Amino acid sequence: CFGLTPLFNQSVSQKAEIVRVGHKDVRGCIACQRCYELGKCVFDDIVNELAPKFEEADGLVVASPVYFASANATLVAVLTRLFYSTHFDKTMKVGASVVCARRGGCSATFDELNKFFTISNMPIASSQYWNSIHGREQGEAEQDEEGKQTMRVLARNMTFLMKSIALGKEKFGLPETEERAFTHFIR
């Protein structure tokens, strides 16, 4: 994803893997809640392949092209089902989203992807600018010097954050949790 993998792999004890989902045939979540019974999504596809990798990982970088000021629909289907069907604690796994556009829609897409992290107690790695890079055709993003610098800073910041959290867990443990309270707006 925009040259981030080598940057993460160069960092001490960090290993990154790219998984491309945009070209896959993936259906959206139907909120059937069978994942609670099965321990995995009822639709047996790439989502169930990603779930154990996600559980083991210290962080997750999600990258998407921008389509109509939103992320790739297949990616959103994968993320929705991945986050919904995995019931392990995601607290303090570091998340980062990266978007690529010809011109506009980056901020809206960036926000859309970050919501998966924030609802899951996952801190978000930041950079010196929003994590976006520009280019339409393959290879054009390589010409975006500011975007490439933003990606390098993001890789370093995310690696630092994951290492800091690992040290913090060792020394202090995870933050205290509360039983989740649910508010229903229908009275």
Q: For the regions a protein language model found, what residue spans apply to each?
A:
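N-terminal beta1-alpha1 ligand-phosphate binding loop
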Residues: 1-13
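Electropositive phosphate-/nucleotide-binding environments in soluble metabolic enzymes
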Residues: 2, 26, 44-48, 72, ...
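Short beta-strand elements in bilobed, periplasmic/extracellular small-molecule ligand-binding domains
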Residues: 15-20, 30, 123-131
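N-terminal beta-loop-helix "entrance" segment that forms/cooperates
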Residues: 20-41, 137-140
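Short secondary-structure capping/turn micro-motifs that flank functional sites
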Residues: 25, 70, 133-134
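Residue-level recognition of specific faces of alpha-helices
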Residues: 28-31, 53, 81, 150
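Helix-loop-strand module that forms the ligand-binding subsite of alpha/beta enzymes
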Residues: 42-129
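Glycine-rich phosphate/pyrophosphate-binding loop and the adjoining helix
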Residues: 123-187
